[in-house]
């Protein structure tokens, strides 16, 4: 089953999510929006097993990385904050 991995611009570039991912779905890419000058990216979402370890590892108050599982993807993405 395919999962959707969304990286938000609240990412602080700490690499915690990248290190927590057991299937190497995430990687860091250059980005000028934070002091670390990098942001998480999810180029291999087809390898995501939906364990959400990346979410658990994220130290930001608003989770900067979110994994949406199957049917949850379309339902959750439509919510307004």
Curated annotation (Swiss-Prot):
Cite the 4Fe-4S ferredoxin-type domain residue spans from the record: 2-31, 39-68
| Residues that, per the record, bind [4Fe-4S] cluster 2 | 21, 48, 51, 54
Catalysis performed (reactions): reduced [plastocyanin] + hnu + oxidized [2Fe-2S]-[ferredoxin] = oxidized [plastocyanin] + reduced [2Fe-2S]-[ferredoxin]
Instruction: Give me the residues that bind [4Fe-4S] cluster 1, please.
Output: 11, 14, 17, 58
**Stored Pfam families:** Fer4_7
Keyword presence, Membrane: yes
Keywords of this protein's UniProt record, alphabetized?
4Fe-4S, Chloroplast, Electron transport, Iron, Iron-sulfur, Membrane, Metal-binding, Oxidoreductase, Photosynthesis, Photosystem I, Plastid, Repeat, Thylakoid, Transport
Q: What is its EC number?
A: 1.97.1.12
Any one GO MF annotation of this record: oxidoreductase activity
InterPro entries in alphabetical order: 4Fe4S_Fe-S-bd, 4Fe4S_Fe_S_CS, PSI_iron-sulfur_center, PSI_PsaC
Primary site of residence: plastid
* Topology class, membrane: Peripheral membrane protein
Cysteines engaged in disulfide bonds, as pairs = none
Q: How is the cofactor bound?
A: Binds 2 [4Fe-4S] clusters. Cluster 2 is most probably the spectroscopically characterized electron acceptor FA and cluster 1 is most probably FB.
**GO biological process terms, semicolon-separated:** photosynthetic electron transport in photosystem I
Q: Which cofactor does it need?
A: [4Fe-4S] cluster
The role this protein plays is:
Apoprotein for the two 4Fe-4S centers FA and FB of photosystem I (PSI); essential for photochemical activity. FB is the terminal electron acceptor of PSI, donating electrons to ferredoxin. The C-terminus interacts with PsaA/B/D and helps assemble the protein into the PSI complex. Required for binding of PsaD and PsaE to PSI. PSI is a plastocyanin/cytochrome c6-ferredoxin oxidoreductase, converting photonic excitation into a charge separation, which transfers an electron from the donor P700 chlorophyll pair to the spectroscopically characterized acceptors A0, A1, FX, FA and FB in turn.
| Identification of the protein by name | Photosystem I iron-sulfur center
Organism the protein comes from:
Nephroselmis olivacea (Green alga)
Q: Upper taxonomic classification of the species?
A: Eukaryota, Viridiplantae, Chlorophyta, Nephroselmidophyceae, Nephroselmidales
């Amino acid at each position: 089953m395919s999962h959707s991995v969304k990286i938000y611009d609240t990412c602080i570039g700490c690499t915690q999510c990248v290190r927590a991912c057991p299937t190497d779905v995430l990687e860091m890419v250059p980005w000028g929006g934070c002091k670390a000058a990098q942001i998480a990216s999810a180029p291999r979402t087809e390898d995501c097993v939906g364990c959400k370890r990346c979410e658990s590892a994220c130290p930001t108050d608003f989770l900067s990385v979110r994994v949406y599982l199957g049917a949850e993807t379309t339902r959750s993405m439509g919510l307004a904050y």
